[in-house]
Amino acid sequence: MLLEFKCSNHRSIKEKVSFSMIAGSDNTSEELLKKFGNFRILRSAVIYGANGSGKSNFISALSFMKDLVSNSINHQPGQGVFQARHKLSAEETPSEYSIQFVRNDIRYAYGFSVKQNLIQDEYLYYFPRGRQVKVFERNGLDVRPGDRYKGVFDVSISILKDNRLFLSCAANYSNIKEIEEAFMFFNTDIVVYNPEINNWTEYSIELMQNNDMIKEYL
Protein backbone atom coordinates (compact mmCIF):
# COMPACT_ATOMS: atom_id res chain seq x y z
CA MET A 1 0.00 0.00 0.00
CA LEU A 2 1.52 3.29 -1.14
CA LEU A 3 1.70 6.07 1.43
CA GLU A 4 3.87 8.71 -0.22
CA PHE A 5 6.16 9.22 -3.20
CA LYS A 6 8.55 12.12 -3.79
CA CYS A 7 10.94 12.97 -6.60
CA SER A 8 13.03 15.84 -7.92
CA ASN A 9 15.11 16.64 -11.01
CA HIS A 10 13.31 14.14 -13.25
CA ARG A 11 12.48 15.29 -16.77
CA SER A 12 10.22 18.36 -16.47
CA ILE A 13 10.18 18.10 -12.65
CA LYS A 14 12.96 20.33 -11.29
CA GLU A 15 12.09 20.96 -7.63
CA LYS A 16 10.88 18.26 -5.26
CA VAL A 17 7.24 17.26 -5.67
CA SER A 18 5.22 14.96 -3.42
CA PHE A 19 2.25 12.65 -3.87
CA SER A 20 0.57 11.45 -0.66
CA MET A 21 -2.18 8.91 -0.06
CA ILE A 22 -2.48 10.03 3.57
CA ALA A 23 -5.85 11.70 4.14
CA GLY A 24 -6.21 15.26 5.38
CA SER A 25 -8.28 16.42 8.32
CA ASP A 26 -11.62 16.32 6.46
CA ASN A 27 -13.66 13.41 7.85
CA THR A 28 -16.69 13.77 5.58
CA SER A 29 -16.22 10.31 4.00
CA GLU A 30 -14.37 8.57 6.80
CA GLU A 31 -15.90 5.20 5.89
CA LEU A 32 -14.04 5.26 2.57
CA LEU A 33 -10.61 5.44 4.20
CA LYS A 34 -8.31 2.59 5.17
CA LYS A 35 -6.77 2.71 8.64
CA PHE A 36 -3.16 1.81 9.41
CA GLY A 37 -2.03 2.71 12.92
CA ASN A 38 -2.50 6.46 13.23
CA PHE A 39 -2.63 6.86 9.45
CA ARG A 40 -5.88 7.37 7.52
CA ILE A 41 -5.16 6.22 3.98
CA LEU A 42 -7.00 7.04 0.77
CA ARG A 43 -8.02 3.96 -1.20
CA SER A 44 -7.64 5.77 -4.52
CA ALA A 45 -6.47 9.11 -5.87
CA VAL A 46 -6.41 11.06 -9.12
CA ILE A 47 -3.67 13.32 -10.47
CA TYR A 48 -5.03 16.04 -12.73
CA GLY A 49 -3.72 19.24 -14.29
CA ALA A 50 -3.15 21.12 -17.51
CA ASN A 51 -1.35 19.60 -20.49
CA GLY A 52 2.39 19.77 -19.98
CA SER A 53 2.11 20.25 -16.22
CA GLY A 54 4.20 17.17 -15.42
CA LYS A 55 1.60 14.47 -14.69
CA SER A 56 3.13 11.90 -17.05
CA ASN A 57 6.66 12.67 -15.89
CA PHE A 58 5.65 12.14 -12.28
CA ILE A 59 4.37 8.67 -13.19
CA SER A 60 7.56 8.20 -15.22
CA ALA A 61 9.59 8.88 -12.07
CA LEU A 62 7.74 6.15 -10.17
CA SER A 63 8.22 3.78 -13.11
CA PHE A 64 11.94 4.61 -13.19
CA MET A 65 12.24 3.82 -9.48
CA LYS A 66 10.42 0.50 -9.90
CA ASP A 67 12.52 -0.55 -12.90
CA LEU A 68 15.84 0.35 -11.29
CA VAL A 69 15.03 -1.62 -8.13
CA SER A 70 13.90 -4.63 -10.17
CA ASN A 71 16.67 -4.68 -12.75
CA SER A 72 19.82 -2.84 -11.65
CA ILE A 73 21.34 -6.13 -10.41
CA ASN A 74 21.90 -6.87 -14.11
CA HIS A 75 23.89 -3.70 -14.82
CA GLN A 76 27.39 -4.44 -16.08
CA PRO A 77 30.60 -2.59 -15.09
CA GLY A 78 30.87 0.69 -16.96
CA GLN A 79 27.15 0.78 -17.75
CA GLY A 80 25.77 4.03 -16.37
CA VAL A 81 22.36 4.64 -14.83
CA PHE A 82 20.19 6.71 -17.15
CA GLN A 83 19.53 10.00 -15.38
CA ALA A 84 16.58 11.86 -16.90
CA ARG A 85 17.45 15.14 -15.23
CA HIS A 86 15.69 18.45 -15.81
CA LYS A 87 17.14 20.26 -18.82
CA LEU A 88 17.94 23.36 -16.73
CA SER A 89 19.59 21.44 -13.89
CA ALA A 90 23.36 21.39 -13.62
CA GLU A 91 25.03 18.09 -14.49
CA GLU A 92 26.11 17.59 -10.87
CA THR A 93 22.57 18.04 -9.50
CA PRO A 94 21.26 14.67 -8.26
CA SER A 95 17.89 13.22 -9.17
CA GLU A 96 16.18 12.06 -5.98
CA TYR A 97 13.45 9.46 -5.45
CA SER A 98 11.85 8.42 -2.15
CA ILE A 99 8.82 6.37 -1.17
CA GLN A 100 6.93 5.20 1.90
CA PHE A 101 4.68 2.17 1.77
CA VAL A 102 3.08 -0.56 3.86
CA ARG A 103 3.56 -4.25 3.19
CA ASN A 104 2.21 -7.01 5.43
CA ASP A 105 1.26 -4.42 8.06
CA ILE A 106 4.77 -2.93 8.32
CA ARG A 107 5.68 0.57 7.12
CA TYR A 108 8.85 1.03 5.07
CA ALA A 109 10.76 4.09 3.85
CA TYR A 110 13.14 3.74 0.91
CA GLY A 111 14.96 6.15 -1.34
CA PHE A 112 18.00 6.81 -3.50
CA SER A 113 19.60 9.50 -5.63
CA VAL A 114 21.36 9.38 -8.99
CA LYS A 115 24.14 11.82 -9.78
CA GLN A 116 26.05 11.98 -13.06
CA ASN A 117 24.54 8.63 -14.07
CA LEU A 118 25.71 6.80 -10.94
CA ILE A 119 23.99 5.88 -7.66
CA GLN A 120 24.98 8.49 -5.09
CA ASP A 121 23.16 7.36 -1.94
CA GLU A 122 20.42 4.98 -0.83
CA TYR A 123 18.60 3.94 2.34
CA LEU A 124 15.98 1.54 3.68
CA TYR A 125 14.18 1.83 7.03
CA TYR A 126 11.21 0.00 8.45
CA PHE A 127 8.94 0.75 11.38
CA PRO A 128 8.02 -2.22 13.59
CA ARG A 129 5.57 -1.02 16.24
CA GLY A 130 5.96 2.47 14.78
CA ARG A 131 9.65 2.79 15.65
CA GLN A 132 12.21 3.48 12.90
CA VAL A 133 14.83 0.77 12.40
CA LYS A 134 17.68 1.13 9.90
CA VAL A 135 18.14 -1.77 7.51
CA PHE A 136 20.95 -0.03 5.62
CA GLU A 137 22.28 3.32 4.48
CA ARG A 138 24.60 3.69 1.54
CA ASN A 139 26.84 6.48 0.25
CA GLY A 140 28.63 5.66 -2.97
CA LEU A 141 29.97 2.14 -2.43
CA ASP A 142 30.05 2.51 1.36
CA VAL A 143 27.19 0.50 2.89
CA ARG A 144 26.33 0.88 6.58
CA PRO A 145 23.97 -1.89 7.75
CA GLY A 146 21.73 -1.36 10.75
CA ASP A 147 22.72 -2.93 14.07
CA ARG A 148 20.47 -5.93 13.46
CA TYR A 149 22.10 -6.67 10.12
CA LYS A 150 25.83 -6.61 10.83
CA GLY A 151 27.60 -9.23 8.71
CA VAL A 152 24.55 -10.46 6.82
CA PHE A 153 25.17 -8.29 3.74
CA ASP A 154 28.79 -9.27 3.08
CA VAL A 155 28.07 -11.05 -0.21
CA SER A 156 25.68 -8.32 -1.35
CA ILE A 157 28.29 -5.65 -0.61
CA SER A 158 30.92 -7.61 -2.55
CA ILE A 159 28.88 -7.43 -5.78
CA LEU A 160 27.74 -3.83 -5.36
CA LYS A 161 28.63 -1.44 -8.19
CA ASP A 162 28.05 2.28 -8.53
CA ASN A 163 25.40 1.52 -11.15
CA ARG A 164 23.48 -0.99 -8.99
CA LEU A 165 21.04 -0.34 -6.18
CA PHE A 166 21.98 -2.12 -2.98
CA LEU A 167 18.36 -3.18 -2.49
CA SER A 168 18.54 -4.98 -5.84
CA CYS A 169 21.80 -6.70 -4.85
CA ALA A 170 20.64 -7.66 -1.35
CA ALA A 171 17.34 -9.05 -2.63
CA ASN A 172 19.28 -11.51 -4.76
CA TYR A 173 22.19 -12.31 -2.41
CA SER A 174 20.75 -12.27 1.11
CA ASN A 175 17.81 -13.81 2.92
CA ILE A 176 16.48 -10.88 4.94
CA LYS A 177 12.73 -10.51 5.31
CA GLU A 178 12.75 -6.69 5.29
CA ILE A 179 14.81 -6.67 2.09
CA GLU A 180 12.51 -9.16 0.42
CA GLU A 181 9.37 -7.26 1.43
CA ALA A 182 10.72 -3.97 0.09
CA PHE A 183 11.92 -5.55 -3.14
CA MET A 184 8.63 -7.35 -3.75
CA PHE A 185 6.69 -4.14 -3.23
CA PHE A 186 8.44 -2.69 -6.27
CA ASN A 187 8.53 -5.91 -8.24
CA THR A 188 4.91 -7.00 -7.85
CA ASP A 189 2.81 -4.39 -6.02
CA ILE A 190 3.56 -1.36 -8.21
CA VAL A 191 1.98 -1.60 -11.65
CA VAL A 192 2.57 1.35 -13.98
CA TYR A 193 0.39 1.74 -17.05
CA ASN A 194 2.25 3.41 -19.90
CA PRO A 195 -0.19 5.09 -22.34
CA GLU A 196 2.62 5.40 -24.90
CA ILE A 197 2.55 1.63 -25.39
CA ASN A 198 0.04 0.90 -28.15
CA ASN A 199 0.83 -2.73 -28.89
CA TRP A 200 0.72 -4.68 -25.63
CA THR A 201 1.48 -7.99 -27.39
CA GLU A 202 4.79 -6.68 -28.71
CA TYR A 203 5.53 -5.08 -25.35
CA SER A 204 4.89 -8.37 -23.53
CA ILE A 205 7.13 -10.28 -25.94
CA GLU A 206 9.88 -7.71 -25.51
CA LEU A 207 9.63 -8.00 -21.72
CA MET A 208 9.82 -11.80 -21.88
CA GLN A 209 12.89 -11.59 -24.11
CA ASN A 210 14.79 -8.93 -22.18
CA ASN A 211 13.73 -9.12 -18.52
CA ASP A 212 15.82 -11.79 -16.78
CA MET A 213 13.46 -12.02 -13.80
CA ILE A 214 10.51 -12.80 -16.08
CA LYS A 215 12.59 -15.40 -17.94
CA GLU A 216 13.08 -17.32 -14.71
CA TYR A 217 9.33 -17.87 -14.41
CA LEU A 218 8.86 -19.03 -18.01
Kindly give the residue locations of the regions a language model identified.
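Short acidic, glycine-rich loop/turn motifs
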Residues: C7, R11, F101-R103, Y126
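Pre-Walker A-like glycine/lysine-rich segment at the N-terminus of P-loop NTPase domains
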Residues: M1-F64
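Conserved P-loop NTP-binding catalytic core
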Residues: K34-F36, R40, A45-V46, A50, ...
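Electropositive, glycine-dotted interaction segments
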Residues: A109-L218
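Structural beta-strand/beta-sheet cores of well-ordered domains, especially the beta-sheet scaffolds
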Residues: L3, S95-Y97, N163
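Solvent-exposed, flexible loop/coil residues
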Residues: V17, A23-S25, A90, G140, ...
